[in-house]
Amino acid sequence: KILVADMSSDILSQPIDVTQYGLIFAGVQKNIGPAGTVIVIIREDLITDDVLNGTPTMLKYKIHSDNNSLYNTPPAYGIYICGKVFKYLKKLGGLEVMKVRNEEKAKILYDYLDSSKLFNGTVVKEDRSLMNVPFITGNKELDDKFIKEAKKVGIENIRGHRTVGGMRASIYNAMPIEGVKYLVEFMKKFEEENK
């Protein structure tokens, strides 16, 4: 069996054992760099010419491997920014430090959601993400009011995914703990005003 993972949302948020995967891919735009750059980590035994007919050249990893990842013009600026982020994370203490920071941020938000009488998290505890925290009020009109009022106080892009609705706090590596605390304080105020 081969495990393939899309780690676009959580790559570099905590240490991972890459040996447990056949292939990891991640758009870097959430935790590493600008949109348009992708990281692929693939197990060597999966780098072969044996691909399905019609597979686009960009997905034929043997071509990339044989050309030292330079088969086409690389996104130089994106790679440059990613390199800066890698150095920054290393300087901070690496992924163990990021994991602790991200767990601390997520705990603040999940603890509030677990105690709130208005807001409810939508993911069971054992499956909760450190990066994306979806929640609802249970009332679409109230969700819309929350989103509108949040925008007025500088909380942007809190609307949930279009297929799920509600709200979603994306607390990626770059989000400081102060940002999460600010969100929770706003949520408490909103809850008090909308009992």
What positions do the PLM features span?
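PLP-dependent enzyme catalytic core of the Aspartate aminotransferase-like
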Residues: 152, 165-195
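Active-site C-terminal subdomain of aminotransferase-like
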Residues: 28-110, 124, 193-195
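Conserved active-site segment immediately N-terminal to the catalytic lysine
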Residues: 4, 18-29, 38
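Solvent-exposed alpha-helices and their adjacent loops that cap or buttress functional pockets
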Residues: 15-19, 30-34, 125-126, 160-161
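Catalytic PLP-binding core of fold-type I/II PLP enzymes
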Residues: 1-19
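Short beta-strand-to-loop capping motifs
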Residues: 42, 135-139, 171-173
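Conserved PLP-binding catalytic core of the aspartate aminotransferase-like
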Residues: 119-150
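A short linear hydrophobic-aromatic micro-motif
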Residues: 118-122, 154-160
